[in-house]
């Protein structure tokens, strides 16, 4: 875990254990990790304060976060205990900033390297940006940057998840016509 305060917002970056196989010692360690994270959050943070908790949480919280729930049934990332741990973490006062802007299925942050899964969009949404209410009300858009996942060599089996938190009183459209235009401007290229 890495934590810093940026422009008055506490940013906490985490990486959850994979869990490997449901029922294994690695899976038990993953659930213990979630319990510890929930305890830390309750002890060290305030749900009324600006907070972003994000990273690879290795959980697809809902069936729409998986390309084929039947194919993944019984595996890690989608099991009942993992989803319950994720729900307990959020129940304290964290909201899924990405899902707020994108309720539709078929949008993922992770694809296996094998069998062309990325190009077939056989993926999972296991990376998350969970935010408290003060941040959620300022989050103007969210996007999965699939472009970063393309090319050779493939940099990662994950794609970056991005949210934009605007200052209060500043309009979203500062000359950009879309979120894609804003991403392109930040990269210094045309949309």
Regions found by a protein language model. Name each.
Residues 17, 58-60, 102-103:
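Catalytic metal-binding/acid-base residues of hydrolase active sites
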Residues 63-191:
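Metal-dependent phosphoester-hydrolase catalytic domains
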Residues 17-34, 70-75:
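Surface-exposed cleft-lining segments at the edges of enzyme active sites
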Residues 49-63:
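Acidic/histidine-rich, metal-coordinating catalytic segments
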Residues 12-14, 52, 98:
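Hydrophobic/aromatic beta-strand patches that form the interior of the parallel beta-sheet core
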Residues 1-21:
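Structured beta-strand-rich core segments of catalytic domains in phosphoester-bond hydrolases
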Residues 39, 43-44, 55-57, 149:
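Glycine/proline-rich loop-helix segments at beta-alpha junctions forming the active-site rim
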Residues 27-48:
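A long, amphipathic alpha-helix that forms part
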């Amino acid at each position: 875990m890495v934590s810093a305060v940026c422009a008055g917002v506490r940013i906490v970056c985490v990486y959850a254990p994979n869990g490997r196989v449901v029922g294994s010692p690695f899976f038990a360690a993953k659930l213990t990790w979630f319990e510890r994270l929930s305890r830390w959050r309750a002890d060290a943070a305030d749900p009324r304060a600006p907070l972003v908790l994000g990273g690879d949480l290795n959980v697809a919280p809902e069936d729409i976060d998986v390309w084929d729930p039947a194919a993944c049934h019984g595996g890690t990332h989608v099991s009942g205990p993992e989803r319950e741990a994720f729900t307990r973490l959020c129940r304290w006062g964290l909201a899924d900033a990405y899902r707020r802007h994108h309720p539709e299925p078929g949008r993922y942050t992770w694809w296996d390297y094998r069998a062309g899964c990325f190009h077939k969009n056989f993926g999972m949404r296991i990376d998350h940006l969970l935010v408290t209410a003060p941040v959620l009300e300022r989050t103007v858009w969210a996007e999965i940057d699939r472009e970063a996942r393309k090319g050779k060599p493939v940099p990662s089996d994950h794609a970056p998840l991005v949210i934009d938190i605007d200052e209060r009183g500043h309009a979203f459209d500062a000359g950009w016509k879309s979120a894609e235009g804003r991403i392109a401007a930040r990269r210094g290229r045309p949309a």
